[in-house]
């Protein structure tokens, strides 16, 4: 019975030692991760800001009032058409659900 006790005690200590070692390794890995994540976020943010600034600059250089007016007109007509079709679709769905 003494050897079983020592074997069980040895296994418990081995498991506890492995958990303590794993906890220490996780604590050592954690400080590096946020720094890497911050670097990646800053890099993506700077690329996005650069692309946005380039797109705005290109838009300002190629701004044409006639094209802008056509786009605004096209947007207003298409949004009016979508509103009409959405209301027709809604009426059809309500008619199907009511069963009239």
Curated annotation (Swiss-Prot):
* GO terms classed as biological process: lipid catabolic process; lipid transport; positive regulation of phospholipid catabolic process
Query: Could you describe the post-translational modifications of this protein?
Result: Proapolipoprotein C-II is synthesized as a sialic acid containing glycoprotein which is subsequently desialylated prior to its proteolytic processing. Proapolipoprotein C-II, the major form found in plasma undergoes proteolytic cleavage of its N-terminal hexapeptide to generate the mature form apolipoprotein C-II, which occurs as the minor form in plasma.
Principal location: secreted
Q: Which residues form the signal peptide?
A: 1-22
Task: State where the protein is found.
Answer: Secreted
Ranges for the region named Lipoprotein lipase cofactor are 78-100
Provide this UniProt record's keywords sorted from A to Z.
Chylomicron, HDL, LDL, Lipid degradation, Lipid metabolism, Lipid transport, Secreted, Signal, Transport, VLDL
Q: Which molecular function GO terms apply here?
A: phospholipase activator activity; phospholipase binding
Entry GO terms, CC: chylomicron; high-density lipoprotein particle; low-density lipoprotein particle; very-low-density lipoprotein particle
Domain of life per record: Eukaryota
Enumerate the residue ranges of region (Lipid binding): 66-74
Name the InterPro entries for this protein: Apo-CII (IPR008019), ApoC-II_dom_sf (IPR023121)
* PANTHER family documented for this protein: APOLIPOPROTEIN C-II
Function text: Component of chylomicrons, very low-density lipoproteins (VLDL), low-density lipoproteins (LDL), and high-density lipoproteins (HDL) in plasma. Plays an important role in lipoprotein metabolism as an activator of lipoprotein lipase.
The UniProt entry's sequence similarity note says: Belongs to the apolipoprotein C2 family.
Protein name in the entry: Apolipoprotein C-II
Species the sequence originates in? Microtus agrestis
